[in-house]
Amino acid sequence: MAPMGIRLSPLGIAVFCLLGVGVIYHLYAGVLSSRLAFFRQKRTVDLRELLALSIDAAVQGGREVKRIREDNTLEEKSKGKTKEGASEKYTLGDLNSHRKMYYLIKNTFPNIQVNSEEHANAEGEATVWTRMIPEDILAKVSGGKEIPAEKITVWIDPLDATQEYTENLLKYVTTMVCVAVDGEPVIGVIHKPFTGYTVWGFVGEGSNVAPRDSYNTNSPKVIVSRSHAGKVKSFVQTAFGNNTEIIPAGGAGYKALALLNPTDDKQETADIYIHVTYIKKWDICAGDAILKSLGGQMTTLKGEQIDYSGLEGNKGGLLASMKVDHKALVKRLPLWEDNKQ
C-alpha cells in the first residue's frame, strides 16, 4: 500500500506563505513597539548610550548635508539678519539634517530637552536607534551612568557653517551634538560630512582625539571667524602683539577642532580660538565639551564658564585654549564693548 501524503494546492501554498509573512510582521512590529515603549517609560538616561546615539545622529544628519550639496539642491533662503547685520542663511541641507538628528534623539529619549538651530514644520521621522554602541566607546567609557532626563539638555547644530556650505567651502562644514547636564557641557560630538571624520569627547571619561604636544602663547596662532576677521584683528593684536598670526575660518566646530591634534589633513591648527560677538549655544557647546574632556577650557572673554541651560545665546564672547594657563590668557585680553550687546 502506498504511503499517505499531504498535497497542497497552489492556492493553499499562497495562503500558507501569507500567514507566515503576517506572523513575522507582527513579531517585528511588536519588537519595535516594545523598544519604543521601553524608552518612553524610562525617566533616566545612560550617558554612554546618549554618546553613541549622538554620534549616530551627527553622522545621519551629515549624510543629508553631503547628499544635498552633491545634488546641488540647496534651496538657499534667509532667516533674516544676524546681530551684526549679515544675512543668516539656511538650506534644505540644514532642514533635512535637523529632521534626521532631532527625531532620532527625541524618538529614543522623548523625555529629554533637545534644542536645535533649525525648526522643521514637516512630520517627524519614525527613526529608531539600533542601540549599537561602537567598540571605541565601549573600551573608553564605562556604562551605568544614569542621569534623570530632566537634568539633560541636548544642543544640536544640524549644519554648522551654512554660509561656507553655500560657497562650497566644505572643509568648514560640520554637524554637532552636545549633551549638557545641569547646564554643564558633558558630551560633545563634531562630525565632518565631507571627510567622514568624527570627533567625540566625554568629560571625565575620554575622547577619540588628543591634544597637541605643545601650544605657543607668546606668539600664538589665533583662529577667528572669517566673517569678523577684520573686526577682531586689533583686539587680538592688542592682546598678543602685532606679529600674531590670525587664521580666519568658518564654523565654530571647525575652529574648536583647530586646537586639537586631528587626523583630518584638511584641518588647520591654532593655539587659541577667539570669538568677540554674540554666538548661539548650539554652535559652541560640542566644542566646549570636547575641549574640557581633554583638559582644555572654553569661557567668555572674561573667563566665565558658559551655562548651557536657559536661553540659546552667549553674549560674552569666547576664549578657548588647551594645555595652557587660561586665566593668564584672560588677563591679557583688552576690554571688548561689543560682547555686552
Curated annotation (Swiss-Prot):
List of residues binding Mg(2+) 1: E117, D157, L159
Residues binding substrate are: E117, L159, D160, A161, T162, D283
Quote the subcellular location field of this record.
Answer: Membrane
Major enzyme class = hydrolase
Membrane-spanning intervals of the chain: 11-31
EC number per UniProt: 3.1.3.25
Q: Name one GO biological process term.
A: inositol biosynthetic process
Q: In which pathway does it act?
A: Polyol metabolism; myo-inositol biosynthesis; myo-inositol from D-glucose 6-phosphate: step 2/2
Membrane topology is: Single-pass membrane protein
Q: Which InterPro entries match?
A: CysQ/Inositol_MonoPase, Inositol_monophosphatase-like, Inositol_monophosphatase_CS
Annotated residues that bind Mg(2+) 2 are located at D157, D160, D283
Where is this chain primarily localised? membrane
Its cellular-component GO annotations read: endomembrane system; membrane
* Gene Ontology molecular functions: 3'-nucleotidase activity; inositol monophosphate phosphatase activity; metal ion binding
The protein's name in its UniProt record: Inositol monophosphatase 3
- Annotated organism of origin: Danio rerio
Gene that produces this protein: bpnt2
